[in-house]
Amino acid sequence: MGGHILVTGGAGFIGSHVCERLINSNEKVICIDNFNDFYNPELKENNIKGIVRNPNFRLYRASITDFDKVKDIFNKNKIDKIIHLAARAGVRPSFRNPGLYQETNVKGTLNILELAKEFGVQNFIFTSSSSIYGDAKIPFSEDTLVDNQISVYAATKRCAEILCSTYHNSYGLNVTILRLFTVYGPRGRPDMAPYKFTEKIFNNEEIEMYGDGTSKRDYTYIEDIVSGIIAALEK
């Protein structure tokens, strides 16, 4: 593949696995992560402990909402490709702090797109979410309309998708949007169901049920997600 690859949110669950795969393939990786307190930041430190000292890995502790700081990172590094994973996650928390979700997921994405345009990035991968489908019929279809978001989180992800499409149409930026369905696996986020259920089972605690227990989720294993992201980056 070659060149320098920027991974935003690279110390998170998915991002750390992406960085690890790239480093193991001898790629040069620039990682931006703000190590926020959505969950214990020490978990993120642990996520990247195996690669943080690798000479092909550069870590910048910064927020994608800080345009000037991120631009400085672009100025210091020849970034050829971008995997944009950084985002405020979580459906329920998005209702409690909608402004923060807009700031990170919309404005932050706009910052990265603008810098990608300015610095001539070759390929831009944006990771969206299955939540944008709202209460769509099952099974999902790629032709399903996505104008019925039912959470602030989903709305911000859809806004970011539209921005990505606009930068492709207006500036020719090579953009690929991936709508990820619930990801699970090693180093999974502690707020996600697999982590919570496992912890409660080990502690012999009751598992809280939302609704009537008939809802279903599509789960995707982390290594499959990483393979898909890398394939999109190489196309």
What are these regions (language model features)?
Residues M1-V183, E223, L233:
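N-terminal Rossmann-like NAD(P)+-binding domain of SDR-like oxidoreductases, especially those catalyzing
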Residues I150, F181-D191, G211-E223:
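Glycine-rich "substrate-gating" loop/helix at the edge of Rossmann-like oxidoreductase active sites
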Residues N40-L43, R189, A193:
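Short acidic-hydrophobic sequence patches enriched in Asp/Glu that either
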Residues E103, E208-G211:
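Short, hydrophobic secondary-structure boundary micro-motifs
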Residues P139, P190-T198:
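A glycine/serine/threonine-rich, flexible loop-to-helix segment
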Residues Y195-I207, R217-K235:
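Alpha-helical substrate-binding/gating segment
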